[in-house]
């Protein structure tokens, strides 16, 4: 089944085919809330759950391939940032109203 999201933060813009952004790993596909923005070359992988009003910017990667990642509401993951988890040891949790800066690495 194809998934679509609206491009543009809280705006009605063109539809983007999300199959290129959302990668299923071990039968887990990223989930996200309403009013989220994903840049065209951002990537979300595996066991990722993201709240409402979030944004993932250019070349940012959220890797839930080895453990879960939980992201709250109103989170901004800026350009080039990487969010990851530790293999079979610790998940990554990001609360509400958080901004992850440009090129930052967040590792659970």
Walk through the language-model features, giving the residues of each.
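Glycine-rich, low-complexity segments
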Residues: 16-18
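N-terminal charged helix/coil linker that caps or initiates catalytic domains
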Residues: 21-26
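Left-handed beta-helix
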Residues: 34, 39-40, 45-46, 51-52, ...
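A short, polar/charged loop-to-alpha-helix boundary motif
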Residues: 69
């Amino acid at each position: 089944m194809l998934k679509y999201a609206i491009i543009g933060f809280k705006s009605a813009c063109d539809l983007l085919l999300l199959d290129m952004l959302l990668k299923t790993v071990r039968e887990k596909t990223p989930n996200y809330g309403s009013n989220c923005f994903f840049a065209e070359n951002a990537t979300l992988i595996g066991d990722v759950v993201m709240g409402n009003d979030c944004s993932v910017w250019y070349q940012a990667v959220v890797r839930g391939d080895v453990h879960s990642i939980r992201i709250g509401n109103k989170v901004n993951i800026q350009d080039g940032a990487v969010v990851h988890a530790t293999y079979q040891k610790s998940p990554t949790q990001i609360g509400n109203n958080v901004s992850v800066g440009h090129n930052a690495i967040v590792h659970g």
